[in-house]
Amino acid sequence: MTPEAFAADVPVSRETVERLEAYLAVLEKWQRRINLVGKTTLDDPWRRHFLDSAQLLALLPTPTRVLLDLGSGAGFPGLVLAILGVPEVHLVEADGRKSAFLIEAARITNTRIVLHTLRLEALPVFPVDVVTARAFAPLARILEGAAPFLLAGAQGVFLKGQSVDDELTEAQSQWTMSVERFASRSDPTGHILRIGEIHRA
C-alpha cells in the first residue's frame, strides 16, 4: 500500500500523510537499534501498521475524548489515532526504550500524547472513553488488566488475530460482556473486537 492509497482509503489530509511519513522514518531508524515491530511488516507499513491502526477510528465510541492504549510499543494503534485527531491519548508502555521511541515519534510528528512508562497494574484509574490494544496480551488478560477502566464504563476496541475464537471463549468464561466483531481491513486473518457492558461472570 502506498501513502496515496492510504490517504484515499482512510481518508486523511496531505498534512496527516506527511506526519505519518515522518513517523515511519523515525520508526525505521529506531528499528535498527531496538525491535519495535516485526521486521517483515516494514515491507508494507502503510497497510500493516497505519491502516491497521487507522481502521479503529470508525469504531470508537462517539464522542471519544480520552483514549487509553495498552502496551503501546511502537505506537500502534494509539499514536496513529492521536495523529488522526483523538483529543487525548494516553499510551502505556513499561519498556523504557520503547517509551523513549514514543517520545521521539510524538515530537517528530508534533503530536500531543500522555505517556505512562509503567506496567498496567501500576496505572492509576482515571476516566477514559475507550481502551485499545494491539499485540498486547490474550483477551482475558487484557480485560483483567483494563477492568478498572472497563467496569467504569469505557469500551474496549482490540485488534486480534487468528486465535480470536479461543481468546473469546476463555474471556467469556470469566466475564459477561457485549461483543461486536469486525473483519480487519488490513489483514485477511485479523479481527477487531468492540467490547462493552462488562461484568465479572
UniProtKB/Swiss-Prot annotation:
- Residue numbers binding S-adenosyl-L-methionine: 71, 76, 120-121, 134
Q: Where are the transmembrane segments?
A: none
The reply to whether Methyltransferase figures as a keyword in the UniProt entry is yes
Q: Which reaction does it catalyse?
A: guanosine(527) in 16S rRNA + S-adenosyl-L-methionine = N(7)-methylguanosine(527) in 16S rRNA + S-adenosyl-L-homocysteine
Which Gene Ontology cellular-component terms appear in the entry?
cytosol
Q: What is its main location?
A: cytoplasm
Q: What is its EC number?
A: 2.1.1.170
Q: List locations, semicolon-separated.
A: Cytoplasm
Could you list this entry's UniProt keywords, alphabetically sorted. Answer: Cytoplasm, Methyltransferase, rRNA processing, S-adenosyl-L-methionine, Transferase
Kindly indicate whether the keyword Cytoplasm belongs to this entry. Answer: yes
Coiled-coil spans are none
Instruction: Give an example GO molecular function.
Output: rRNA (guanine-N7-)-methyltransferase activity
Q: Which family is this sequence assigned to?
A: Belongs to the methyltransferase superfamily. RNA methyltransferase RsmG family.
| Chain's role | Specifically methylates the N7 position of guanine in position 527 of 16S rRNA.
User: What's this protein's name?
Assistant: Ribosomal RNA small subunit methyltransferase G
Q: Which species does this protein come from?
A: Rhodospirillum rubrum (strain ATCC 11170 / ATH 1.1.1 / DSM 467 / LMG 4362 / NCIMB 8255 / S1)
Phylogenetic classification of the source organism = Bacteria, Pseudomonadati, Pseudomonadota, Alphaproteobacteria, Rhodospirillales
| Gene from which the chain derives | rsmG
